[in-house]
């Protein structure tokens, strides 16, 4: 079964796990994120801050802060949508509003535009660019950006994403696949 199809049929617990993975990969490697999820999977539904931090120690660069992000986000989502992520994500008519909610909602900790895009793409939604340091460096190297620095505002993220979308059209590569191609060229691997 194709990856996107698996995600479209995943239950809410699996979607929550994927959101946690994206919280873990912010400021860390994809491998660190995967290992961190493995370490806390059994705690995602109800683990305390202390239990999560203990499980992450030696696995993640920021065990205490990431544990706090999980607790705050879980509590917010339990109140907002009873952790029914599929239903909540489907409630948005506009895909940009969906990402804005993840990136800007104060109750969701640890996600900016990059990781919100990462999560949405990983759960099978299309039209979002994952503008990590590898992608930004590639865009800088081919002259599409003046700097490889991450976009610091929503407006800059959207403008950079639009440049990637235009570049995808120019080179005739699917927009939703281009960042993965560029990422794998820089890292030498595809993890998920």
Question: What does each model-found stretch correspond to?
Answer:
Residues 18-27, 72-75, 121, 180-187:
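Short, hydrophobic/amphipathic alpha-helical patches that form generic packing surfaces
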Residues 1-7, 67, 82-100, 106-192:
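C-terminal accessory module of base-excision DNA glycosylases/AP lyases that mediates lesion recognition
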Residues 1-61, 66-68:
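Structure-specific DNA junction-binding interface
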Residues 24-32, 44-45, 78, 127, ...:
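Short alpha-helix boundary/capping elements
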Residues 39-109:
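Alpha-helical ds-nucleic-acid-binding substructure associated with the helix-hairpin-helix region
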Residues 36-39, 76, 119, 171:
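Short alpha-helical scaffold segments that flank and stabilize functional sites
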């Amino acid at each position: 079964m194709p990856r996107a199809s698996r995600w479209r049929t995943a239950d809410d617990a699996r979607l929550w796990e994927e959101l946690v993975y994206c919280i873990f990969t912010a400021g860390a490697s994809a491998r660190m994120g995967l290992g961190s999820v493995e370490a806390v999977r059994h705690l995602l539904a109800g683990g305390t801050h202390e239990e999560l931090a203990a499980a992450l120690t030696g696995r993640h660069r920021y065990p205490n802060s990431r544990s706090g992000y999980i607790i705050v986000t879980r509590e917010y989502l339990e109140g907002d949508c009873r952790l029914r992520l599929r239903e909540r994500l489907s409630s948005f008519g506009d895909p940009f509003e969906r990402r804005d909610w993840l990136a800007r909602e104060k109750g969701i900790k640890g996600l900016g535009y990059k990781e919100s895009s990462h999560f949405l793409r990983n759960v099978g939604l299309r039209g979002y660019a994952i503008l990590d340091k590898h992608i930004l460096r590639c865009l800088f190297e081919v002259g599409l950006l003046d700097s490889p620095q991450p976009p610091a505002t929503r407006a800059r993220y959207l403008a950079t994403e639009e440049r990637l979308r235009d570049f995808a059209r120019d080179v005739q590569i699917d927009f939703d696949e281009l960042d993965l191609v560029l990422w794998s060229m820089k890292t030498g691997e595809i993890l998920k």
